[in-house]
Amino acid sequence: MTIQKNWQELIRPNKLQVSPGSDATRFATLVAEPLERGFGQTLGNALRRVLLSSLQGAAVQSVQIDGVLHEFSSIAGVREDVTDIVLNIKDISLKMQGEGPKRMVVKKQGPGVVTAGDIQTVGDIVVLNPDLQICTLDEGAEIRMEFTVNTGKGYVAAERNRPEDAPIGLIPVDSLYSPVRKVSYKVENTREGQILDYDKLTMTVETNGALTPDDAVAFAARILQDQLNVFVNFEEPRKEVTQEIIPDLAFNPAFLKKVDELELSVRSANCLKNDNIVYIGDLVQKSEAEMLRTPNFGRKSLNEIKEVLAQMGLHLGMEVPGWPPENIDELAKRFEDHY
């Protein structure tokens, strides 16, 4: 059906490349390539908006401090006033498995610093930034605070967290539910075969640790997928199952596999891409000397490639009769499940 060509023949990435940062639970860079021209901006902007606004998380909704009637008070022996304490409470990062609202309490005597790690939580609430300072107590000072924790999405201002029947002394807190703290993306040109006119989308994601960055992106993509389904007003025709005739090849079908599927280091992969080596068939015909003449390609990259090829029963310097075939892209798709 011709209409199917609208989406079936568009180029799309084989997989998402995830490079964890110093803390894999909080930082990562994700790369998707190749994408059709313009899709980098389209997908990057949409994912960024959903990541920052629509993912579920947990946060403090309100706090009650013993002896305090409102947020414009001060507490004897506590160096910070209540307004500053509330601002610090807003920065507490939480992970909660079940539904809210739930309570957690902190009680401490001075002298010393009250941190988020001092909070007594119930079983399914985890404080993700225990070193966060909430307030400082002088000698003889004491403080007790009770927090209300709930789940939600995005940002909710303190005014919306004040219930109509709020008791005296309940102080609402701005709630930042989103587990995603920062998202940035950039779009660059990339190559697919001989064509340079494709997009490469690179996203840098930072979370509070409640979700890993790649899980956060996965949930954001699922939200977009679900929202876009309403615009699809047709049923996809079922594919007729036919017995495909696999042609005989003069070479190993594994040569039709692309080198970017070999999970090489970034340096080695970039060297191959810059030398226009797309398929394994292109690679195995090269000699070691030819590879070492490739710009920025050193002995370490050579050994890495030799090891990967050896695991496939291949090596550099092979003779490949009939390579490259005229219909190489078509053959690569047909043999995708056979090598």
UniProtKB/Swiss-Prot annotation:
E.C. number: 2.7.7.6
Keyword field contains Nucleotidyltransferase: yes
Pfam families referenced in this protein's UniProt entry, alphabetically: RNA_pol_A_bac, RNA_pol_A_CTD, RNA_pol_L
Alpha C-terminal domain (alpha-CTD), as annotated region: 251-339
Ranges where the record places region Alpha N-terminal domain (alpha-NTD): 1-235
CDD domains linked: RNAP_alpha_NTD
EC category: transferase
Keywords, sorted A to Z: DNA-directed RNA polymerase, Nucleotidyltransferase, Transcription, Transferase
InterPro entries: DNA-dir_RNA_pol_insert (IPR011262), DNA-dir_RNA_pol_RpoA/D/Rpb3 (IPR011263), DNA-dir_RpoA (IPR011773), RBP11-like (IPR036603), RNAP_asu_C (IPR011260), RNApol_insert_sf (IPR036643)
Keyword field contains Transferase: yes
GO CC annotation terms, alphabetical: cytoplasm; DNA-directed RNA polymerase complex
GO terms (BP aspect): DNA-templated transcription
Catalysed reaction equations from the record: RNA(n) + a ribonucleoside 5'-triphosphate = RNA(n+1) + diphosphate
GO molecular function, one term: DNA-directed RNA polymerase activity
UniProt function note: DNA-dependent RNA polymerase catalyzes the transcription of DNA into RNA using the four ribonucleoside triphosphates as substrates.
HAMAP family in alphabetical order: RNApol_bact_RpoA (MF_00059)
Subunit field text: Homodimer. The RNAP catalytic core consists of 2 alpha, 1 beta, 1 beta' and 1 omega subunit. When a sigma factor is associated with the core the holoenzyme is formed, which can initiate transcription.
Free-text comment about domains: The N-terminal domain is essential for RNAP assembly and basal transcription, whereas the C-terminal domain is involved in interaction with transcriptional regulators and with upstream promoter elements.
Family, similarity comment: Belongs to the RNA polymerase alpha chain family.
Protein name from the UniProt record: DNA-directed RNA polymerase subunit alpha
Lineage of producing organism: Bacteria, Pseudomonadati, Pseudomonadota, Alphaproteobacteria, Hyphomicrobiales
